[in-house]
Amino acid sequence: MNNIILEIAKCCEVEKAKLNDSHSCNKIVMSQNDSFQLTEPWNGHLDNAEILFISSNPSIDPNENYPTASWKDEDIVSFFENRFEITPKNEWSTYWRTILKWAGWIIPNIGFDKIAITEIVHCKSQKEFGVYECMNFCAEKWLKEVLSVYNGKYIVLVGKVAQIFNDKVKEICPNKIIIKTPHFSRPVKGLTDEKRKQDFLDQLH
């Protein structure tokens, strides 16, 4: 498992994309500066998680203390595996707080020790910049690898990009329960928390 984390974090396509304007990942890779934040494999204890959330790609904060190529391998693995534990609660992102609430609709009182998050595209960018150009390439390269580590029962596809790959996720994980929900950052008219919760519960059966 640690090998997969490092393979994704140090994805060999990044350097290829920097040198090739026609590479599917060129746009998203070149959106970062010289201090490249590593490709994000997943967050949490994926092999022990009971719920996995999949969204489009990780957002980027240039000021975050986040792994770069200068980090030791063991520190990179530890960062992603233990990210929820090492991040103070007052620094949790809106996304983290939201999925924790959603997870509680599936398994009451669940904590981040049993939740993992990953993305279709593993490179970071702001507002999904470059995602549509590289999503098929990235999913083909890494989605099966990531899902092979996950032993839990529930997969939540958050937002449009993740749901494009619904059939592929089902093919890889035919025995999982897959729940689809709009991304909270893209408001849907009339979709209250109560309606979203009921939609979650309806998809559990």
Functional labels for PLM-detected ranges:
Residues M1-A9, D34, V121-H205:
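Glycine/proline-rich loop-helix segments at beta-alpha junctions forming the active-site rim
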Residues N2-Y150:
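A polyanion-binding, active-site-adjacent surface
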